[in-house]
Structure formats: C-alpha cells, structure tokens
Regions:
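Conserved NTP-binding/hydrolysis module of P-loop NTPases
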Residues: 52, 56-57, 64-101
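Winged-helix-like regulatory helical subdomains adjacent to P-loop NTPase cores
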Residues: 233, 239-318, 337
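Walker A/P-loop nucleotide-binding motif
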Residues: 25-45
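Conserved Walker B catalytic segment
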Residues: 107-173, 181-184
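Short amphipathic alpha-helical interaction segments
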Residues: 146, 314-330
C-alpha cells in the first residue's frame, strides 16, 4: 500500500499559490535535500496538486532541457487538448514527460521552428478558464545553466503577461546553491525554497504503522519503535525497511515481530548500500573514502561524530582533514548538523 508520510504543508501552500493568481510568489518553488530524502516524491505530489486544480503538467528533463519541451512535450500537450471539444473543454489533469515517440518537425518551406516562449504562449491560449501550466524539473543541479536561464526567462515573461504558469524544481542542496550563483538564475533566487529534512520519529511511526495496516499487517508498538530508530527518519530507508518488514509478516500471516525486523535488516542495509551509497562512492578519491571509513568506525551508537574523533582515528590533526571533510559535505555524502 502507498501511504505518504510527513508534513503536507508544502503541497497545500503550493496549491494555494495556484489559486492565488499569476503574480503569486508560491508559484515558483525550489525543493532541495540530500539523496533519498524524498525530493522526487515531493515533485510528484506537487504535480498531483496541480492536476487536481485542472492544470497541465509538463515534465522537463535535466540533461536536455529546451529542445524536448518545444519538439515533444508541448506539442503532445496541445494535441491532447485539441482532442477535446473546445466548448466543453475541462482538464482533469494532463502530465506530459517528453519520454516517448511523439515529436514534430518542420517541413521544407514551413515557418521557423517555434521558440520555447512561443510554444508556451500557444499552449496557454488553448487552456480553458481556471487552468494553467506547471513545469517540473528534477535533478536541477544537473541542468545546463544557459538552458535553465532560457526556461526561467520564458516562465518569467509569461507571468509578466498574466499567464497562469508555475515552475517547481528539485535538487541536491549544494548543487542548487552552486547553480544559483550563476548570473542567469536571478529569477530562481527569488523563488520559494523548501529544504526537505528527515521525518520525525512520530511521523516515521505513523507511516510505517498506517502503511502496514492498509495491507492487513499489524506492527506492534515495540517493533515500530525499533524500526523507526533504525531508519533515523530517512525516507528511502523507511520505505525500504517497511516493504521488507511488511512482506515477511504478510507471508507468515502474523503481526510483525522483532525477529522479523532482525531478519530483514541485513538485506535492507545491503540494498541501501548498493542503490545509494555504492554509486556515490564509485569515483571517490582515496583520502575521502578513508575519511568515511574512519567516520563509520567511530560513529556507532552516535547520531553525529566530532571531527576530532575522526581525525584521531586517521592519526591526523583536525586541520589536516578539514579540507577532505568539506569536500564530502560539498558532495552531499555527509552533512554538518550545525550548518
């Protein structure tokens, strides 16, 4: 079963922005957070919120931003709209991702290929009353800064013309911060910024309990508490652990037990390592990898590790490892609770 956990204020505020008119600042949103914190899920929720308001959702792709929007995504949205009776046209929610076989090309002698802003204006002209266009972009830190400027400039111009258009993007914190230093991203610096954080223990307990209950599996309070502690509020791990715990208890047809939790934990942590940690460590320099290994050695039983303890484990002074520590923070592989 699917149960969304955590605070829904982000989605509610965004929905209020869609109702607020073209000048509402909540219509431009940047979501950031570390790997596995739920940024893509948050974007999906924003898309669903827009669809519930009758808006069209256009998903932009980070590695090739403008051309697919103009050649594929917007034409596909227009084709979907034009299939409806103009007099009775009402959008219940259209999402176009740009991944597929729909595209348009100009035949010889045709007018020049349309621009992004021209294509968006054409789409807005076709919209029924009280509808609009939401453009979403995941992994924004991977986008070419010049193309991002083209997109945000188009959104800004359309908003100035009173068009109902919104933009929501998600990315890693330091990557987003670096991107916003680019001179072409002034518009995004004024966007609403939401930083996703780990779920609270209470939220973790609730989502594990409610998800299992929807599938007919009971997780006793003691098991819930230990499971929540293991996840540390990390959404990817909550989902992964919850899935394995639910599956094992469901097979037995009995409430989940501490034995179930102990049995699934090794596989859960291995999967976490394979899917999240291993790709992130693949090309890591030896000094940074050694720092992480030392940190893991001394962290057991602690939420955070003093830099001095890591330096001691490495046989070095704090000043000698400070640059390595900063590089790992920049890579979003570790974080400082005091930052």
């Amino acid at each position: 079963p699917v149960v969304l956990g955590g605070d829904d204020s982000l989605t509610r505020n965004f929905g209020a922005g869609l109702d607020g008119g073209p000048g509402d600042p909540r219509r431009t949103l940047l979501v950031s957070g570390p790997r596995g914190i739920g940024k893509t899920v948050a974007l999906n929720e924003l898309e669903d919120e827009a669809a519930s308001h009758g808006w069209i959702v256009l998903r932009a792709q980070p590695y090739e931003l403008i051309e697919p929007l103009v050649a594929t995504v917007i034409p596909q949205a227009l084709a979907t709209l034009r299939q409806q009776d103009p007099g009775r046209r009402r959008i219940s929610g259209v999402t176009v991702s740009g991944i597929g076989g729909f595209s348009t090309t100009a035949a010889p002698g045709d007018k020049p290929a349309p621009s992004l802003i021209g294509s968006l204006n054409t789409l807005c002209d076709e919209l029924p009353p009280e509808s609009g266009v939401l453009i979403t972009l995941d992994e924004v830190q991977s986008v070419n800064a010049k193309e991002l400027w083209q997109l945000t400039a188009a959104v800004q111009d359309l908003r100035r013309d009173g068009r109902d258009i919104a933009f929501a993007a998600a990315g890693l914190p330091d990557g987003v911060a670096s991107l916003l230093q680019h001179p072409g991203t002034t518009f995004l610096r004024r966007a609403q910024h939401a930083v996703l954080a780990p779920m609270t223990p209470a939220e973790t307990l609730t989502v594990l309990r409610d998800t299992a209950a929807q599938g007919g599996v009971e997780i006793p309070v003691g098991v819930l508490t230990d499971a929540a502690t293991l996840t540390r509020g990390y959404p990817f791990l909550i989902q992964l652990l919850g899935y394995h715990l639910f599956e094992r208890a469901s097979r037995r047809g009995q409430p989940a037990s501490h034995d179930d939790l102990a049995a699934v934990t090794p596989d859960v942590l291995k999967t976490l390592g394979d899917l999240v940690h291993q790709p992130a460590l693949l090309h890591l320099p030896a000094a940074e990898l050694a720092y992480l290994e030392a940190m893991a050695e001394v962290q057991e039983g602690q939420q955070a590790v003093p830099s001095a303890a890591i330096a001691q484990q490495l046989g070095k002074r704090v000043q000698q490892v400070s640059m390595v520590r900063q590089k790992l923070i920049d890579r979003e592989l570790i974080y400082s609770p005091r930052r």
